[in-house]
């Protein structure tokens, strides 16, 4: 028999669930919209309680402040077990009373660190793979479809490098966009984008494609290695890739 605690995907709700479930030896935390629950299993829809969440976060901060950062990363992942992985990791941390990330012999710690690393790897990749296009209005637009919810993790990086530009990073899969203008940025819901590239953008794209294919040495192509360094899911957003 298991008791399922359904969260709404927010940090505060997750930490409330940790508080509610901690003394439950059969707890399973999840934000999945559909769960397969067996006969006799319990089901609880978690209601956010800021006081409970704050108590849990204060406890964690006192043991290992970096763990709060790790939990934030884990909960951004596109992994069906992310809440449970984060919860079990926190149990190890609280029960040991000291940082647990180095205890990779523990499967709960290892799974949590794997998910955390996957999110970090995608952020790192997108800093290099993201392609901005200049619209006719002069705004730079970069569509993407990351595995994980990382748009707001990308915004500070590009805001620091494109200070004088207005730009949009659009997660077309989740329907959210990071918008930067005059030193400030926010992340908001966004539908399908419709825009016209500027004349300069069309010229640059044409030149870049010609350059990319001109410098390619056919005899040295290694598609397997290419896929390892540049996952196929990013290709459709790259200027140099044919449509």
What residue spans do the PLM features occupy?
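N-terminal ordered "arm"
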Residues: 1-50
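Internal, well-folded beta-alpha domain core
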Residues: 99-189
């Amino acid at each position: 028999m298991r008791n399922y605690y359904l969260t709404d995907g927010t940090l505060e709700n997750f930490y409330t669930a940790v508080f509610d479930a901690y003394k439950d030896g059969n707890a399973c935390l999840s934000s999945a919209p559909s769960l397969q629950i067996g006969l006799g299993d319990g089901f609880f829809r978690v209601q956010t309680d800021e006081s409970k969440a704050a108590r849990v976060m204060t406890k964690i901060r006192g043991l290992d402040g970096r763990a709060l950062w790790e939990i934030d990363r884990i909960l951004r992942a596109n992994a069906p077990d992310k809440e449970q992985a984060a919860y079990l990791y926190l149990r190890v941390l609280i029960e040991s009373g000291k940082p647990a990330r180095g205890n990779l012999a523990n499967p709960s710690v290892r799974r949590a660190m794997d998910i955390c690393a996957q999110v970090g790897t995608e952020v790192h990749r997108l800093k290099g793979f993201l392609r901005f296009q200049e619209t006719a209005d002069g705004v730079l637009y970069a569509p993407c479809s990351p595995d994980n919810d990382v748009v707001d993790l990308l915004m500070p990086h590009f805001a620091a490098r494109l200070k004088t530009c207005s730009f949009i990073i659009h997660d077309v899969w989740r329907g959210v966009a990071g918008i930067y203008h005059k030193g400030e940025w926010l992340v908001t819901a966004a539908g399908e984008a419709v825009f016209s590239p500027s004349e300069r953008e069309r010229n640059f794209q044409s030149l870049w494609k010609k350059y990319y294919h001109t410098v390619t040495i056919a005899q040295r192509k290694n598609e397997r290695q290419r896929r390892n360094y540049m996952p196929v899911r990013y290709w459709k957003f790259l200027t140099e890739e044919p449509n």
